[in-house]
């Protein structure tokens, strides 16, 4: 089992959610986050003064998936989140040692 974490542009969330849902991913966790990478933020004009915005709004998506789905999930996220411009985001894949469904006590892949 793997935990796939993707940091994407907020306006791409619906497309990514639909792509994951259509391939059978049962659930995701979404968190609003801020960060920066190579784009290093940007300058905004507010009431005649320039301000540097260091952290850009992003969305973090987390999905626990069976090993057999990992490559397909990565491809789905890449395809749905890509704009071809800087700041499209990153995908991280972590090993999951254990998953427990609290309500039923199911463990492992059955708990996904």
Segments predicted by a language model, with ranges:
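Positively charged, small/polar-rich N-terminal and surface patches that mediate targeting and assembly
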Residues: 1-112
